[in-house]
Amino acid sequence: MKRVPWAGIILLLGLAPLALGGYPLRLAGEAVAWAMGATSLAFLYRTTGLVSLGHAAFFGGGAYVAALLTRGDPSYYFLALPLALFWGITSAVALGWLGLRSHGIYFLMLTLAFAQLIYVLAKQGFPGITGGDDGLTGIPRPPGLEGQAAYYLTGLGLLLGVLALYRAFLASPLGLVLDALRLNERRLEALGWDVRHYKLLAFALSGALAALGGVWLAGQRGFVHPHDLAWTTSGQLLVMAVVGGIRPVYAGALGAVVLIFLEATLSAYTNLWNLFLGIFLMIAALLRLRRGKGAEHAPSGA
């Protein structure tokens, strides 16, 4: 059987918006940023089995860091990017240090509460800094990337680099340990491994990637809004990861592209686009559930 040339297919799909230009190219640029955020959640689930509703704090927080530092001078992106990553890592470590003591629904609710805390602080706590309900506008792009095509291509290259590192990480000794942790945490603990330490590491890496996506979204749109920090944004990122299959390396990217372009297409034809989008998500969830059950009952190979 011939191997499918996935690299060539991905390259062609990635370059297609350049030929279309205009609105499709802007949508593609936005999809790249959301893909990074969705990939951060897919990575967390793939390596630890954890599900978070707090990633909007990292995603939107990265966007706000970029906005606050670059509104006056785009050359400050050299400082905004590492500080946004620092925000993603430190806030994830703080949340993980508290949250990883709990499991299941308790962990999920704690992450949601954290995101809402950051959301309220940005919206009402420091309106003179964050812009309050109005957010912040006039965010420039990095020098040399002012054009949409250049910004999109750079973001696409960054996303592909992230996915390549993600794939390499899974095959590394550390990635194999995390995979074993996801499959049987108690057995790993019984063998003397500090599983909480490894979970915290995965959570920190996930937070950094989400913050990177937020930085890229701020430059793409030119504004940030408190909604970027709300738990609904976490839910949107999670839905993207699930639509893409959540376990494959490309899950977050695929889900982001599908939802961004599907939403844009439906909203262009009907005011009821949310209804049709919801129906699509229900069908996607049912298909995933059926596929999962089929995999459970499939006979194992010799």
Question: Residue ranges of each PLM-predicted region?
Answer:
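Extracellular/periplasmic helix-loop junction at the C-terminal end of a transmembrane helix
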Residues: 114-145, 175, 270, 291-297
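Generic structural signal for small/hydrophobic residues in well-ordered secondary structure
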Residues: 28, 52, 65, 92, ...
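Transmembrane alpha-helical segments in multi-pass inner-membrane proteins
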Residues: 81, 92, 203-291
